[in-house]
């Protein structure tokens, strides 16, 4: 295979964009382990005056990811996020005005390999979120285990993510007067194993917990589809029933997160590596589904609203797929 190297005369801005994406990628693939290693090092070599105050503070701060987190506008305004957004680039599209007197659940689809669109749009101040949705604060919910790693949790929370636990979602949606948006990647870890280019398989049929929470809090549901999310990486073929898929699913059940074997391009060449491809991401926010607060919803009410949500999600995909190069015969597959 002939290696295609990047030309030397690439503009500085594009180099900075690649560096920004590399920083983000390494943050999620390696930084947690580095932070854990730092704590272990401090304990082994008895730097008690460093680790003891932090671990004491950590004990009292443990619930913060379930209580709205601790975002930093300074971190969200870092210039590196502008280069990160422009690398793909990432776009946020609004199709309907939202009433800031309500709280909302944005159901984000698809998961993709690393949920790039969700981070770029809802965890930095360089997306069009503030202009499109004035009066709102968004909270991207991520797996709780990210917040169990000392030091890394502080870095992660500074961009705005909070835990995806029920307690955390309920906390966000309990704001009096509205104006909060819980962004939940509903397909979760399982869906990442089906994040192949040109494929649109969503794990949604058994995901009904978010519907019950929406009913109990009267939070409006909004389907969100991120066109281009599955085009950023290629995965090793892992069809249902294959030995690789079986291993991945078993590991996912044990660890709580999936391990897709993905690849894309490198820093200085285009043939192999872990840097995502430069593919545009268009995150389209659909029409809100009004939800009447029901403190003790029945299974029938949950099922009915869940069905309505899936219909609105499919409608959103069908209405916009042609704008983003998806063939007319392609459709969503709900699992």
UniProtKB/Swiss-Prot annotation:
<feature type="transmembrane region" description="Helical">
    <location>
        <begin position="24"/>
        <end position="44"/>
    </location>
</feature>
<dbReference type="GO" id="GO:0019432">
    <property type="term" value="P:triglyceride biosynthetic process"/>
</dbReference>
<feature type="glycosylation site" description="N-linked (GlcNAc...) asparagine">
    <location>
        <position position="180"/>
    </location>
</feature>
<dbReference type="GO" id="GO:0006651">
    <property type="term" value="P:diacylglycerol biosynthetic process"/>
</dbReference>
<keyword id="KW-0443">Lipid metabolism</keyword>
<comment type="pathway">
    <text>Glycerolipid metabolism; triacylglycerol biosynthesis.</text>
</comment>
<dbReference type="InterPro" id="IPR007130">
    <property type="entry name" value="DAGAT"/>
</dbReference>
<keyword id="KW-0444">Lipid biosynthesis</keyword>
<keyword id="KW-0812">Transmembrane</keyword>
<keyword id="KW-0325">Glycoprotein</keyword>
<keyword id="KW-1133">Transmembrane helix</keyword>
<keyword id="KW-0472">Membrane</keyword>
<feature type="glycosylation site" description="N-linked (GlcNAc...) asparagine">
    <location>
        <position position="125"/>
    </location>
</feature>
<dbReference type="GO" id="GO:0005789">
    <property type="term" value="C:endoplasmic reticulum membrane"/>
</dbReference>
<feature type="transmembrane region" description="Helical">
    <location>
        <begin position="104"/>
        <end position="124"/>
    </location>
</feature>
<keyword id="KW-0319">Glycerol metabolism</keyword>
<dbReference type="GO" id="GO:0006071">
    <property type="term" value="P:glycerol metabolic process"/>
</dbReference>
<keyword id="KW-0012">Acyltransferase</keyword>
<dbReference type="GO" id="GO:0003846">
    <property type="term" value="F:2-acylglycerol O-acyltransferase activity"/>
</dbReference>
<comment type="function">
    <text>Involved in glycerolipid synthesis and lipid metabolism. Catalyzes the formation of diacylglycerol, the precursor of triacylglycerol, by transferring the acyl chain of a fatty acyl-CoA to a monoacylglycerol, mainly at the sn-1 or sn-3 positions. It uses both sn-2-monoacylglycerol (2-acylglycerol) and sn-1-monoacylglycerol (1-acyl-sn-glycerol) equally well as substrates, and uses sn-3-monoacylglycerol (3-acyl-sn-glycerol) with lower efficiency. Probably not involved in absorption of dietary fat in the small intestine.</text>
</comment>
<dbReference type="GO" id="GO:0004144">
    <property type="term" value="F:diacylglycerol O-acyltransferase activity"/>
</dbReference>
<keyword id="KW-0808">Transferase</keyword>
<protein>
    <recommendedName>
        <fullName>2-acylglycerol O-acyltransferase 1</fullName>
        <ecNumber>2.3.1.22</ecNumber>
    </recommendedName>
</protein>
<keyword id="KW-0256">Endoplasmic reticulum</keyword>
<comment type="similarity">
    <text>Belongs to the diacylglycerol acyltransferase family.</text>
</comment>
<dbReference type="Pfam" id="PF03982">
    <property type="entry name" value="DAGAT"/>
</dbReference>
């Amino acid at each position: 295979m002939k290696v295609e190297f990047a030309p030397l005369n690439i503009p500085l801005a594009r180099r900075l964009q690649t560096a920004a994406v590399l920083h983000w990628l390494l943050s999620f693939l390696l930084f947690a382990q580095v932070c854990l290693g730092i704590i272990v090092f401090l304990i082994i070599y008895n730097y008690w005056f460093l680790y003891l105050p932090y671990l004491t503070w950590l004990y009292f701060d443990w619930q913060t990811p379930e209580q709205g987190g601790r975002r930093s506008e300074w971190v969200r305004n870092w210039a590196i996020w502008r280069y990160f957004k422009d690398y793909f680039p990432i776009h946020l599209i609004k199709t309907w005005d939202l009433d800031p007197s309500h709280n909302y659940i944005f159901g984000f689809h698809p998961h993709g390999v690393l949920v790039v669109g969700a981070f770029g749009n809802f965890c930095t101040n360089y997306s069009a979120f503030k202009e499109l949705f004035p009066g709102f604060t968004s909270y991207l919910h991520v797996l709780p285990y990210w917040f169990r790693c000392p030091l890394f949790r502080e870095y992660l929370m500074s961009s705005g993510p909070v835990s995806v636990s029920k307690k955390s979602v309920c906390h966000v949606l309990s704001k009096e007067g509205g104006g909060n948006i819980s962004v939940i990647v509903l397909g979760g870890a399982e869906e990442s194993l089906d994040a192949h280019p040109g494929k649109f398989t969503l794990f949604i049929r058994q995901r009904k917990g978010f519907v019950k929470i929406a009913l109990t809090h009267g939070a409006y549901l909004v389907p969100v589809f991120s066109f281009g999310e599955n085009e950023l990486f290629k995965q090793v073929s892992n069809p249902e029933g294959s030995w690789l898929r079986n291993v991945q699913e078993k590991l996912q059940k044990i660890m709580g997160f999936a391990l897709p074997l993905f690849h894309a391009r490198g820093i200085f060449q285009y043939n192999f590596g872990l840097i995502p491809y430069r593919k545009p991401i268009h995150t389209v926010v659909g029409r809100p589904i009004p939800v009447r607060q029901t403190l003790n919803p029945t299974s029938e009410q949950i099922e009915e609203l869940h069905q309505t949500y899936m219909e609105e999600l499919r409608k959103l995909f069908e209405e916009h797929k042609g704008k983003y190069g998806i063939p007319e015969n392609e459709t969503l597959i709900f699992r």
